[in-house]
A protein has these predicted regions:
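Internal metal/ion-chelating core segments
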Residues: 88, 115-116, 138
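Hydrophobic/aromatic residues located in beta-strands of well-ordered beta-sheets
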Residues: 62, 87-89, 112, 149-153
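Conserved strand-turn element in the central/C-terminal portion of the radical SAM core barrel
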Residues: 138-157
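Internal, well-ordered alpha-helical segments in soluble enzyme and binding-protein domains
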Residues: 100, 131, 135-138, 151
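Short, histidine-centered active-site or binding-site loop motifs used for metal coordination
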Residues: 34-35, 116-120, 155
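Alpha-helix N-cap and loop-to-helix initiation/capping positions
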Residues: 42, 46, 126-134
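Conserved alpha-helical substructure of the radical SAM core
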Residues: 1-102, 107
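Conserved radical SAM core fold
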Residues: 69-71, 93-98, 114-129
Length: 157
């Protein structure tokens, strides 16, 4: 409650949501990025300036979504550069290798939300065959590297 009082009194938002890319390696039915073309994406330098300005304004959290944020090679690099910001990166998990998970863990300011549709059949149906195992592997890599991560369950009827 104390935190919410501060947030409500704040003159600026505490969270900035960004979609550095709308590109994705999946073609999920019902996904808002499915039919979008990734044009006019901000460059790494432009994102760097945006995040610096966010810091200067007192914003504390950057939510990074997409598309698939890890299609870009600057997602963690920018978090490493802006240590005073907390980055919440929402991913489908398909690019999270052991090495990337370790880098995320070392950064100390990244929370990775890995989305999943449910069990094997649901996830594979919406994404593609084998996607469920990819998500579990990504989450396992994050867990083993001691990276702060959340499994984000997508519920739909």
């Amino acid at each position: 409650r104390a935190y919410m009082k501060i947030v409500i009194k704040a003159k600026i938002p505490v969270v900035l949501a960004t979609s550095p890319t709308m590109s994705c390696n999946y073609d999920c039915v019902g996904c808002y990025s499915r039919d979008r073309v990734s044009e006019n994406e901000l460059s790494t330098d432009e994102l760097d300036k945006l995040y610096k300005e966010a810091e200067n304004l007192g914003i504390s959290t950057i939510v990074v979504t997409g598309g698939e944020p890890f299609l870009r090679d600057d997602s963690v690099k920018l978090a490493e550069k802006h240590k005073r910001l907390l980055f919440v990166i929402i991913s489908n998990g398909s690019f999270i290798s052991k090495e990337l998970a370790e880098r995320i863990s070392r950064s100390g300011n990244v929370i990775t939300l890995v989305s999943i549709e449910g069990f094997t059949a649901d996830t594979d149906l919406r994404r593609k065959k084998g996607a469920y195992e990819v998500v579990l592997s990504a989450f396992d890599s994050l867990k083993k590297s001691d990276a702060f991560s959340v499994l984000l369950l997508r519920i739909q009827q």
